[in-house]
Amino acid sequence: MARLYADEQYPHPVVEYLRVLGHDVLTVQEAGKANQKVPDSEVLAFAAIACRAVLTQNRKDFIQLHRAQTSHGGIIACTNDRNWEALANRVDAAIAAEESLPGKLIRVVRPAAPQS
């Protein structure tokens, strides 16, 4: 399973579901970096040093960081989804589809609502 680093705004219920699925998830809060306004570039650098991929819903900024620097532990950029368990399952499936995470940008999107 994957070693992940959840940024400050990442939903804690999703973190808990990912842990149940067997992933090693460290949160910004657990790392002692909460409420410090740590720049995204430093979040990415910390994760790389810790050999972890970043979990984020801050897609725009982290996609830009990936384009500027592909040498990182991986970025999993998710759309917002209040169905925490479904989001965790999509993240898990996206991770399982990859051989490794370093240097990768993985986008996890909420499925479109069914048309009626």
Residue ranges and their predicted role:
Residues 1-8, 12-20, 26, 35, ...:
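Acidic, PIN/NYN-like endoribonuclease modules and their adjacent C-terminal/linker elements
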Residues 40, 50:
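Basic, amphipathic alpha-helical patches used to engage nucleic acids or provide basic targeting signals
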Residues 52-65:
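Acidic, metal-binding active-site segment of PIN/NYN-like and related structure-specific nucleases
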